[in-house]
Regions:
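Non-catalytic, solvent-exposed segments at the cell envelope interface
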Residues: 1-350
């Protein structure tokens, strides 16, 4: 019988015998996009196929390291990585490569998010006061002997633990708001109704926050690495981060991105530049449409400034869309801002 891994430990993932559930299954590809604030590139930095076995009440997280080989049409063989397929060949080809590596025939839905969007989603999952620390912890790889494989496994375990921790709250009003907020922050073809259906079916077939034996993390392609398993409880995040920082400071040196003002300064500079171009709506749209899709303001730690810069960005973008007669795009932004404000008022988001 499959025994869940609990607490901080080390495992040889080749020795684990995973359950083989039967019945209906829905597969959702979760992709973390590596694009800096305002950048339009879309390399897949985190790749996790989450399979919901509805009739068995089980969940399988298949984690694929970004360094996994795939034909990304790079002339440099070092660039032939699955993370780069999303960048060079687009989402459909990337999903095909994920199917090949994971040996899964069908992917039903995709959920993609960049750094800022991930911050917001992690806040929703119970890390409201330390989302940036949690994200830093699960993105770190330089301090681990297994490098990228360990990082990918860490992310898979984070997803597993987050599902367990939050699942029992998804059927109350706050939990439903949380699901809506997470979907609103993502680029996805997964609707709220479809997400609710998955959760309801799992619940009806025995899955809950106290069934750790019903959810597990696999690595594909198969590997015999010894991998560490961490407890990602919010209270333990600071301990893990401190351990990483003490090891990594001699490897990478100073990191300005840890400065809370770093992202705020980028946003201020961008908006100051765009404000001079308000009579050129095409230029405003070109400059701000992508930062809006990234939900770039969420990286700003000071909540008042976060909201202030969000409002300015959205105001400029809505006006530009209206000037070009693109009222549907303008309305989408207004609708999102209203949603985010409702999430914040409910306590779902910071």
């Amino acid at each position: 019988q499959f025994q869940p891994i609990i607490g901080d430990t080390t495992v040889d993932i080749d020795d684990i015998e995973y359950p083989i559930p039967s019945g209906r299954v829905i597969s959702v590809l979760i992709t973390g996009i590596d694009s800096r604030l305002g950048e339009k590139t879309a390399r897949a930095d985190a790749n996790h196929l989450v399979r919901f076995f509805l009739d068995s009440g089980c969940v399988e997280v298949i984690s694929v390291p970004r360094s996994t080989y795939a034909d990304a049409k790079f002339t440099d063989p070092r660039g032939q990585l699955i993370g780069n397929v999303r960048l060079t060949l687009g989402r459909d080809r990337y999903m095909k490569e994920i199917r090949r590596v994971t040996e899964v025939k069908k992917i039903d839905f995709f959920v993609e998010f960049g750094f800022s969007q991930a911050m917001g989603i992690i806040e929703i999952m119970g890390y409201k006061e330390n989302a940036s620390s949690a994200l830093r912890v699960i993105r770190s790889r330089k301090v681990y002997a297994a490098g990228d494989k360990q990082r990918s496994y860490n992310q898979g375990q984070f997803i597993r633990q987050a599902i367990l921790r939050s699942f029992d709250h998804t059927d109350d009003l706050m939990g439903q708001l949380g699901v809506r907020a997470a979907l609103a922050l993502s680029t996805t073809n997964l609707s709220y109704d479809a997400a609710s259906y998955i959760l309801d079916e799992l619940r009806a077939n025995g899955f809950n926050s106290n069934t750790p034996d019903r959810i597990w993390v696999k690595m594909m392609p198969k590997s015999s690495y010894q991998l560490k398993v961490f407890d990602y409880d919010s209270a333990n995040i600071a301990n893990i981060e401190t351990s990483i920082e003490s090891k990594v400071k001699n490897i990478v040196g100073k990191n300005d991105r840890k400065n809370p003002e770093y992202y705020a300064n980028i946003m201020r500079s961008l908006l100051a530049k765009v404000e001079k171009d308000t009579n050129k709506p095409e230029r405003v749209i070109d400059s701000l449409a992508h930062p809006f899709r990234q939900r770039s303001w969420i990286q700003i730690q000071n909540v008042q400034e976060r909201i202030s810069l969000r409002d300015k960005l959205c105001y400029l973008l809505v006006n530009a869309y209206n000037k070009k007669g693109k009222t549907a795009e303008a309305f989408e932004i207004v609708q999102y801002v209203e949603q985010e404000d409702a999430f914040r008022k409910s306590g779902t988001m910071k």
